[in-house]
Amino acid sequence: MTQLQQPIKFAYWVPNVSGGLVVSNIEQRTDWSYDYNVRLAQAAEKNGFEYALTQIRFTAGYGAENQHESVSFSHALLAKTEKLKVIAAILPGPWKPALAAKQLATIDYLTEGRIAINVVSGWFRGEFDAIGEEWPEHDQRYVRSEEFIRTLKGIWTTDNYSFDGKYYQFQNYTLKPKPLQKPHIEVFQGGSSRAARDMASRVSDWYFTNGNTVEEIQKQVEDIRTKAKANNHQVKIGVNAFIIARDTEEEAKAVLQEIIDKANTEAVNAFGDATREAGAASPEQQGNWAKSSFEDLVQYNDGFKTNLIGTPQQIAERIVALKNVGVDLILSGFLHFIEEVEYFGEKVLPLVRQLELQQEKEVEIQAKSA
């Protein structure tokens, strides 16, 4: 089955940190508590979401004063769901691959193969300094992350595993039991730099990119897939999007404007300063948010840029347009998570599936007439 024949998948950001997904003083009927997140996870899997992504934060800032740890929180959500796969974010440095491999293999065993990992290379030096962790320069963080991923996959698939890298070494190590998922637990990563894209094209199963226009996303997809093909590797693409689905376009745009009008200016500017400092440390001297305006930065991962804001029909058409340029998954954020996840499942997702089916039939007709 080709990429275009595969139904596009949906994930959501788990609000396991306080403050929601917008740096705004607007009312958010979203809660970082465990009870709320259990209800959200159960609603999400009933409404067509296949993945959930927990966040990893060690320090407060930009509205996130409280943060639950990602791996244990992921496991807790898996215990209360039946189908949802939860992606636990992990930072090389605080986590060592031997511990992560065993921890995740155990969770995989306990949850019948529903854990995944998002390897976060890190962009905020202040957080690493606060917890006493080494802060390698930009490209070296990706060298470390690539070794981390290679060793995880090696441990999960090989007995008597040995590895001699710059950051990690193993000698004849055998992990038992190994994960239930075959060939191994899925590995996600993000980042927009050359080093991030190159790493994705060599070792990751999934690559998350910040929100952007269809045209810009297409450029990234083509770049990564071209590199991956040269490496005899396959990687899937997920795109961040903050979804505002309402009965009318005017309602949706009014919500967006209210979010921006009520932005926490001090926190947004501080986030912008931190991202520019981080970007300047990369070889390209720009990072994920180099072209992001103040309005874009109100949503951490440029989710407004993806423009899934409007009526269910408008959003469904834009999702299929993203699929047509090679996107495999939409990583979604919402203002009021539970009620909007339910609205999405009821109003938007059926339209997406109808458009996919219609497009597939058109392709079949064209193929027969060719």
Name what the model sees in each region:
Residues 2-16, 131, 138-181, 212-324, ...:
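An alpha-helical appendage that flanks or caps ligand/catalytic pockets
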Residues 51-71, 211-214, 332-345:
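Glycine-rich, proline-tolerant flexible connector loops at the mouths of alpha/beta enzymes
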